[in-house]
Amino acid sequence: MISEERLLKVILAPHISEKSTVCAENNNTVVFRVAIDATKAEVKAAVAKLFEVEVDSVRTLVNKGKTKRHGARTGRRSDWKKAYVTLAAGADIDFVGAE
């Protein structure tokens, strides 16, 4: 069993983009930024508990941080993980919270 404290640290934020909006409309899929060390099972449990929805599947990927220049110096942005969470038919997550 995964601790409740860990579940709260797994999901960092919803990832809003043109592609994620199309996925949400057509495939009932929501996209989240998650902790880099989070597993699919942890993501599934966290979404189910926090948003009280049934999760069908979870797909994850790691985006590698880009190398950026600041004048003569080079730096690197952090790697981050993204999770595509497919919800069960009829389930919905409302991020705006409008009533």
UniProtKB/Swiss-Prot annotation:
Molecular functions per Gene Ontology: rRNA binding; structural constituent of ribosome
Pfam name, any one: Ribosomal_L23
Keyword Ribosomal protein part of the UniProt annotation: yes
Entry superkingdom: Bacteria
Keywords tagged on the record: Ribonucleoprotein, Ribosomal protein, RNA-binding, rRNA-binding
Biological role: One of the early assembly proteins it binds 23S rRNA. One of the proteins that surrounds the polypeptide exit tunnel on the outside of the ribosome. Forms the main docking site for trigger factor binding to the ribosome.
Family per similarity comment: Belongs to the universal ribosomal protein uL23 family.
Protein name as annotated: Large ribosomal subunit protein uL23
Gene: rplW
